[in-house]
Each structure stands twice: as structure tokens, then as C-alpha cells.
Amino acid sequence: MNSSYLRRPTPATLLREHQSVIGAPLDRVFAALAAAVDPGPESHFAVDPAAGMIVVQGGWWYRAEYLVTADSAGTRIQFTLLNVASPAHWAGPITGRAAIRSSAHDFGDVIEKVRLSSSASPSAG
């Protein structure tokens, strides 16, 4: 993990935002989300549990920010998709149009994984 990736680069243009609430404790949701969105070595990945922030940045234009906060119904996850291309910032949304178009569906898939993982009983041991 490189914490420098937690700072949002400039330019950064908002492309999509989605959010959902999961009825589980924040610490379990955060851990499940981090596991669900960790892209492995092909992308930059940073986690700051104290700030409730997870960042995935890959390629030259793509940046996904997840903010995890307490909610009266459990835990809220806010997803922000950004274009951080530099140079040729204008080309990010063109190159990423499929990812932008599928972001709501993809976020729903992540939420389902997190919901299943965070609602599972912690194993004894």
C-alpha cells in the first residue's frame, strides 16, 4: 500500500457516484470492501481505515474512491468514479466509457459481495 495514492490528483473530474447502506458494523464492512475491491498488483491500491477511505487507481484515467462511514442503519459506502487522466484529460471518459456505463452494475456487484461477506458470522478460532 502506498498512502500517497490516498491524495486525489489533479485534474480529477467526477464521472459517477453511487452509494449504498449495509446493515453490518463498520469494521466488518470496511474489511470486506477492501478485500472485494483489491485489484492485486496491476493497479494502485491504498487503504486508510482511520479515514474510512479505499482508493483504487489504474491505467492512466481511472480512479475509484470508496468512503465508508457509520449510518443509523449500519454502514454507508459511497463510491466515486473519477477521471484523473493527465495529459489528455479529455480522452479519459472516451477511453473509459464502458467502465463508466457499467459503474452502477459493478458497484451493485461489489455491494452484494460485501453484504455476503460482512454478514457472515466471524469464525471462532
Question: Where do the protein language model's features map onto the residues?
Answer:
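Beta-strand elements of well-folded, non-transmembrane domains
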Residues: 22-24, 62, 83-87
